[in-house]
């Protein structure tokens, strides 16, 4: 595979101009605010507009507020049953593509992979769905006696017809189990980002600080915030922290429990992975309980080691000494990996297309000598772009809320490889572009191996059945 030269601002701006030229004048003016070439100096002309309504007709792939609450924040809590209050389709779509791993027995004390819904029908729209929800809550308690809580996630019809889920949840206090009601109807806000905020508010109002002093505390207790254990990444983070000598008392919310969430205020430090979805609760705990928090990044050795050092600064000399020993062990490992794979990947071009601004993963590619030439985000806010601006080089393309049908297809022609999330990946898979996500020190070895493997032109050697002569059987 031939590697194309490094990007420059003029090249990126020319590509953006070509994309915008395909739009009507008014739409082009609107989209021009969302497509920019990166300027490390942060000039006003290169500021990316974000977190505003998508243009009608632009085929956005944003999620909704319901997906942000149910699919991201509440769904991964393993000992809570999440019930989607509304039609069956929303719950299935929001959960079918996520791999939130969790310990436990499915359907006994782990409910993360279960799709439970009130299955709204037309008559429920006409007559109201409160009785159906109350019946559903009764059935959950009967079927899953080891469940520690229930979260009710509202879909669009609930808000449109004005069902009072708060009243139903209060009536269900007789069930002797906490019932969290979350007003996360999909039409609220401009993307799933508002769903994150609504879910954080529900945790703040109904869960945070309710856990008692049920365990012996130490000076080294930390909480993992905004790590949803997709593919087991929270477990990789936990291993690193434990090798530093720290004790993880709570995971929010991948492989986490409601009791952990209720007791997180006892943590000495909150470590936030996904800033966009959980910064709200971290600032709340800082204001209410005085708990400090910091972002961390365990993607790629450079960022891992930098984050380990930053975290260690919050603790005493014992933790700092253990941290230095852990880093020394990791360094030998990653040096061998980099030596083996960097020569094969040097200069390859990558585009990252995910939900929030992809500032976490840029370092992994750069550690292998690859160059990130574009970053696309669906629900980033203005402050999210300070990450890519700081990490990305001059001329890197920044694409906010890109159109699935046209914009992503055009900018995807530029790189050698695409890194993407579960919603974005399908279009790139159909285009024959390889994609993989990895996390942690152990994951870096697999990441490097597979990045090299994906550069083999295997797909170019295959012929699609419909391109052959004759009919497909």
Curated annotation (Swiss-Prot):
Binding of [7Fe-Mo-9S-C-homocitryl] cluster, residues: 274
GO biological process terms, semicolon-separated: nitrogen fixation
Record EC number: 1.18.6.1
Cofactor annotation comment: Binds 1 [8Fe-7S] cluster per heterodimer.
Keyword Iron-sulfur: yes
Requisite cofactors: [8Fe-7S] cluster; [7Fe-Mo-9S-C-homocitryl] cluster
Record's GO cellular component terms: molybdenum-iron nitrogenase complex
Coiled-coil stretches noted in the UniProt entry, renumbered to this chain: none
InterPro entries xrefs: Nase/OxRdtase_comp1, Nase_comp1_asu, Nase_comp1_CS, Nase_Mo-Fe_asu
GO-annotated molecular function: ATP binding; iron-sulfur cluster binding; metal ion binding; nitrogenase activity
UniProtKB keywords: ATP-binding, Iron, Iron-sulfur, Metal-binding, Molybdenum, Nitrogen fixation, Nucleotide-binding, Oxidoreductase
Catalyses which reaction(s): N2 + 8 reduced [2Fe-2S]-[ferredoxin] + 16 ATP + 16 H2O = H2 + 8 oxidized [2Fe-2S]-[ferredoxin] + 2 NH4(+) + 16 ADP + 16 phosphate + 6 H(+)
Binding-site positions, [8Fe-7S] cluster: 64, 90, 156
Keyword Iron-sulfur among UniProt keywords: yes
Subunit structure: Tetramer of two alpha and two beta chains. Forms complex with the iron protein (nitrogenase component 2).
Function: This molybdenum-iron protein is part of the nitrogenase complex that catalyzes the key enzymatic reactions in nitrogen fixation.
Membership in a protein family: Belongs to the NifD/NifK/NifE/NifN family.
Stated name of the protein: Nitrogenase molybdenum-iron protein alpha chain
Gene designation: nifD
């Amino acid at each position: 595979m031939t590697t194309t030269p490094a990007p420059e601002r003029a090249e990126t701006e020319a590509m953006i101009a070509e994309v915008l030229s395909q739009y009507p004048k008014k739409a082009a003016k609107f989209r021009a605010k969302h497509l920019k070439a990166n300027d490390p100096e942060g000039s006003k002309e290169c500021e990316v507009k974000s977190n505003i309504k998508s243009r009608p007709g632009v085929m956005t792939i944003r999620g909704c507020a319901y997906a942000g609450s149910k699919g991201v924040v509440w769904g991964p809590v393993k000992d809570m049953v999440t019930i989607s209050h509304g039609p069956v389709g929303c719950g299935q779509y929001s959960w079918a593509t996520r791999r939130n791993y969790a310990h436990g027995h499915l359907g006994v004390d782990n409910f993360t992979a279960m799709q439970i819904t009130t299955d709204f029908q037309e008559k429920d729209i006409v007559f109201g769905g409160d009785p159906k929800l109350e019946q559903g809550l009764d059935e959950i308690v009967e079927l899953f006696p080891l469940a520690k809580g229930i979260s009710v996630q509202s879909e669009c019809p609930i808000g449109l017809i004005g069902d009072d889920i708060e009243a139903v949840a209060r009536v269900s206090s007789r069930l002797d189990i906490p019932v969290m009601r979350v007003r996360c109807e999909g039409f609220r806000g401009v993307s799933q980002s508002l769903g994150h905020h609504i879910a954080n508010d529900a945790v703040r109002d109904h869960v945070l600080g309710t856990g008692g002093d049920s365990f012996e505390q130490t000076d080294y207790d930390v909480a993992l915030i905004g790590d949803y254990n997709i593919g087991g990444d929270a477990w990789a983070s936990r291993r690193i922290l434990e090798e530093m000598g720290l004790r993880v008392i709570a995971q929010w919310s991948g492989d986490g429990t409601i009791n952990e969430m209720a007791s997180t205020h006892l943590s000495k430090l909150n470590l936030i992975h996904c800033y966009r979805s959980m910064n709200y609760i971290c600032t709340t705990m800082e204001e209410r309980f005085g708990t400090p928090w910091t972002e961390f990044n365990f993607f790629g050795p450079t960022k891992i080691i930098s984050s380990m050092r930053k975290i260690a600064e919050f603790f005493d000399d014992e933790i700092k000494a253990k941290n230095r020993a852990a880093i020394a062990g990791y360094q030998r490992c990653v040096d061998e990996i980099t030596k083996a794979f960097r020569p094969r990947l040097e200069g390859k071009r990558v585009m990252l297309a995910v939900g929030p601004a992809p500032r976490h993963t840029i370092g992994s590619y750069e550690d292998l000598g690859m160059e990130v030439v574009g970053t696309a985000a669906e629900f980033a806010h203005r402050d999210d772009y300070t990450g890519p601006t700081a990490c990305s080089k001059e001329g890197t393309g920044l694409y906010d809320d890109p159109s699935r049908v046209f914009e992503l297809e055009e900018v995807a022609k530029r790189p050698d490889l695409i890194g993407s999330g579960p919603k974005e990946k399908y279009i790139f898979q159909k285009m024959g572009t390889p994609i993989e996500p990895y996390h942690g020190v152990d994951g870096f070895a697999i990441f490097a191996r597979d990045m090299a493997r994906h550069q083999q032109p295997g797909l170019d050697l295959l012929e699609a059945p419909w391109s052959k002569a004759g009919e497909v059987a």
